[in-house]
Amino acid sequence: MKNFLQNRLNTFYIFLFFYFIVGSYLSLSVGITHDEAHSNWVWELNKKKLLNIFFNKEYDVSYLETYHGFYGIGFYLVSTPIEILYKNLVNIKNVDFEGNILLLKHPIVFIFFVISGIFFRKIILLVTKDKLFSDLTTILYLTYPYILGHSFFNVKDIPFMSVWLVNTFLIIKILDDIFNKILVKKKAFITLGILTAYLLSLRISGILIFIEYLIFFIFYLNNFNIKFLNFLKPNIKNIFIFLTSFIFFSFLFYPSFWLDPFKFLDAFKFMSQHIQTACTVTLGDCMKAQNLPTSYIFIWSFFKLPLIILFGLLIFPFLEKKLFSLKTNILLLAPLTCTVLSIIFLLIIFNVNLYDELRQIMFLIPIIFIISLIVLYNYSKKITLIITSFFIIFFIYQNIKLFPYNYLWLNNFNIFIQVDKNFEKDYWGVSTKKIANYLNKNNLENNACVISNRNEGIKHFLKSSNICLKPFSDLHKKNNRPFYVVMMERSLNKGTPINCTLIHEESIKINLSQEKVSLAKVYKCI
């Protein structure tokens, strides 16, 4: 039976290919979220800046002198050439020109997620040396609804998470080869330097990965009983190569810093206290990003992580002696654990602004998965494989049921609490496409306007460009009736508009709960 399963799972990469095809297709069916237009606008500004520098153009790029210049261009360096290819292969219907540009980035985000799955598997395999376990747990990770949902549209956090995981694998391989006296080619250090710089170009908080590098380095030094100076002497050239490539490409990926390198310091300071006026509904409280309780990360982790992962974390302390009797776990599991704890501790101590559930620490979720799954493997491989298989089936069912709102998934503890009132819902605005489709199918009365807080997302999918769209701030002004009100994202909490009737509602049911979770509403006001 075991050999049969192993032979079947030798087709993992065939599965990954079809997974990529299906996921890429589905990503094009997801609405346009609020971050996408802004990110693309910043990229356009950076392109204009490059044209100003190299071709003596005179475009206005003054916005890059503000905090907008703190965003790198890494994602778009990759997405732009792929986009050109997709334009010739994919024909997206019922979307305007600008919307088409934004939607074509969705499958590219999904590519990053698939790459993260490849390196997730590599890390699990490094620790367990068990192909069957590595394949199954990677499928578990790839079908996890919360991250899968984000991989359909999240142009910032998913690429960042994926590249972090790639760099984690690279630092493990490089250190392992160095300390085991295996020749490491210079291109490995150059690659790590480039990808570390690329990580910063996705999010300036990528600088945190040096904490992970340092922790791994300390564990390897200690385990091999090598003094720092004895390590430094034969490896100083390689360290210099890494740092040089890192610094060079960090500046290359940030055109707005070319004339003033010290802006990097401003970027680190600004992004650590990123201004966010919205609050995140957490257990019924609207927690403000600037004044979060220390429990914020732990509450969302408790409800977002799968039960199998929570169980692995729960039994970790009881298996500590067994786990760290193995050298592999000391060199891999221990540093990964220290990395997660250190970063979370620093975020809490420095009161870093966090919002929108776990998006700022999403890059830690694959590492938390790896930690928990390694613990479970050491606890009982057989039981873990059975439970993992069950969760994969359950996740597939949930993904089909929730699409395109997969990212809103909560674990089964949701049956003990009313999600609609106690947690943030469609805060990204994925429902824009479905709402637009509803408006398209149900012809609006002549000259009737639509008032919404997400006009920028809805407009791309409207068949008629003549539909009157008004900002949400116009709701309490004198408007010609009839008119329509679309409430989504955080505006859902503002109550029912006066003299308006609910005519459509987007909602989901999570897991086994029968609770209807409202995501968007359309009202007709007469």
Language-model regions, residue ranges each:
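Hydrophobic/aromatic-rich transmembrane helices and adjacent perimembrane loops
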Residues: 157-163, 199-204, 208, 299-313, ...
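Short acidic/glycine- and proline-prone juxtamembrane loop motifs at membrane-interface regions
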Residues: 33-34, 152-160
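Catalytic lumenal/periplasmic loop and adjoining terminal transmembrane helix
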Residues: 24-25, 29, 75, 255-258, ...
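Short helix- or helix-capping micro-motifs
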Residues: 137-142, 149, 169, 196, ...
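Transmembrane-helix signature of polytopic, membrane-embedded enzymes
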Residues: 10-14, 91-95, 115-143, 162, ...
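Extracytosolic helix-loop segments that constitute the early lumenal/periplasmic catalytic or substrate-binding loops
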Residues: 25, 37-74, 81-93, 274-283
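Transmembrane-helix motifs of polytopic, lipid-linked glycan transferases
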Residues: 103-128, 166, 170, 321-322, ...
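Transmembrane-lumen/periplasm boundary regions of multi-pass, lipid-linked membrane glycan transferases
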Residues: 47-49, 68-77, 198, 210, ...
